[in-house]
């Protein structure tokens, strides 16, 4: 795709300078960069330069491209300052600083170049920093990163998860970003900085120390808190078996997280693609996921944690729109899982809407399926009439009742009469959705839906191994539909609403599900991944 632009990890160059303090200068002298006065006891200078690299330091064997200007602009820039015990000392604002590559693409390298800030006063005990760009601070809903809120608090208390929607952290010109981190645990978020002290008390020596600090900056990378998903249809696209017809109709995300951490700790895993990372979100462990042990509360619990594309149960309900065009992208909150927690109910996925018509039928016509065979309405009525008992004589009435075309207590005579007189205009796009989970399926105008679980690391080939599924912040997942070999379901695959009689429960392992795909992923650490998808 022409617009596959990489969301880049940004790098921040920080320089710190501590000075020996002695009396004799005014506060105005200090503001002008002269020898600071006694009122500046316990302070140091901090200089910050923000630069987005054209290749991240952790991505060693993958292609990268700069993000767009809308994905890269830096407005508010907050630097949280910590002592050696990870207790916050203060917050330094670098709003308005020119950030490297914040203008987006330019010949594949990004512009503008980074500009170092003027030195700012910070506590002398500053040993570590955490950077946040474009923070979501909407009242009580977002993070409160003011000095009054965070001073004196340990990093473990500051690093909270909040309930959010993707628009809170990923809108044009306002993508929230935070330090990417390097080490294990949540403390890995904090980058150590070196304090440079002058070897004398003259202005020349102070200036020399400032220059030394800026010449040897600490480098800090930040990630966007969002993940990006894109779907395309390969050209040529393979439709099987021969004679079948497939028309792409749209796509949408489902099972998206409702919470996001300020910093999600890095997780190591076996057979990782060099340069790839995995992280721990709020509901990473199986014990942290929604309680699905009680069917009466399962759906409520799941919907409190994730957003799902939902089916309809009545004609008055509106069918959810699945209409994102091929070649488009959207963003979602990070959603990661421990190895044994990679389950259908909690794994972010793509739902594809399409029209699939079997080779024996008129393209985009309505049809029924039953036990692997496809029928027009008239063919189904004939098959039903010629079946003395059992088989379709049993299964079709079950579907009609579930679809609310006949009353639940209708007797055999009433059902037979209804089927005899049933016409195509008595069936709608909602019929097959309301009548879901039956042996008989109805595809109105050949419309169906496919489930595509998003794989994280293609290099993880062992089933249910850590790092195999999930969407990670600052990762861009490109799904490429390559082929199709059969119709999907007439209803939206929704793990929070499983088949009550023959369920694939939300607790089913991702690698044991009957998802309609086989996948292939290659990594590019926005970290950029390509996933080939075969629908069936």
Question: Language model features by range: what are they?
Answer:
Residues 58, 66-147, 219, 228-232, ...:
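Tryptophan-paired
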